[in-house]
Amino acid sequence: MSSYFVNSFSGRYPNGPDYQLLNYGSGSSLSGSYRDPAAMHTGSYGYNYNGMDLSVNRSSASSSHFGAVGESSRAFPAPAQEPRFRQAASSCSLSSPESLPCTNGDSHGAKPSASSPSDQATSASSSANFTEIDEASASSEPEEAASQLSSPSLARAQPEPMATSTAAPEGQTPQIFPWMRKLHISHDMTGPDGKRARTAYTRYQTLELEKEFHFNRYLTRRRRIEIAHALCLSERQIKIWFQNRRMKWKKDNKLKSMSLATAGSAFQP
């Protein structure tokens, strides 16, 4: 992981000391061990593979190094950060702690080689303090988000019982407006023997269907849909009506032909 980041970082910024780095001032303010782009690690800089600024704002109550980081990070605001992208102050990369090439003190800036043990102890305590702050803030953010998400849902859930109570009072049937009714007689009623009642069409619907049948005895699906919309009927009703009308027309023609045949044979000499 670190090798991929080092290669991409060195290719993006060929002159490391001459480039102005975000959250860390100019390149001259860094120590000599970090001026080489090949020696940079993901933990010491708040950058991901795609160049996003993932650094964490530090409080100014700590040492001057972390205070400068907090001020410069406020000067360059980063996008909305998610807790899963935050890195603890004591980690340098996503690998295991045993394989880390640097220590806790080196993750946020190189210390002088001749530092006293007291300085190392203070740096370790400060890094542990920042780690606890990060964990607390990361754990508090999901709780705040959950509370914000739950509060609007509760606010929306409260007016619902009021709306239902006003729409349908107790002991009363809901009011049915004229636009809720069907234009033709309902065919869902059942007769006394349990069979479906005969579909009753209005005079206007029957007249329009008869006119359409006069021009064409067989309908396409598109024309059937158009008639169903025009007459406020279902497509299935139009299909069944035309089937019944064709059977009636065939029966009438058969009877007419038979009567003509019998009449013709009667007049034969």
UniProtKB/Swiss-Prot annotation:
Residues 194-253 bind DNA. It is found in: Nucleus. Residues 163-173 have a biased composition (Polar residues). Keywords: Developmental protein, DNA-binding, Homeobox, Nucleus, Transcription, Transcription regulation. Residues 88-102, 113-128, 136-158 have a biased composition (Low complexity). Spinal cord. One of its GO terms (cellular component) is fibrillar center. A motif (Antp-type hexapeptide) lies at residues 176-181. It comes from the Eukaryota. GO terms for molecular function: DNA-binding transcription activator activity, RNA polymerase II-specific; DNA-binding transcription factor activity, RNA polymerase II-specific; RNA polymerase II cis-regulatory region sequence-specific DNA binding; sequence-specific double-stranded DNA binding. Residues 77-173 are annotated as: Disordered. GO terms for biological process: anatomical structure morphogenesis; anterior/posterior pattern specification; embryonic skeletal system morphogenesis; endothelial cell differentiation; regulation of transcription by RNA polymerase II. Sequence-specific transcription factor which is part of a developmental regulatory system that provides cells with specific positional identities on the anterior-posterior axis. Belongs to the Antp homeobox family. This is Homeobox protein Hox-B5. The gene is HOXB5.
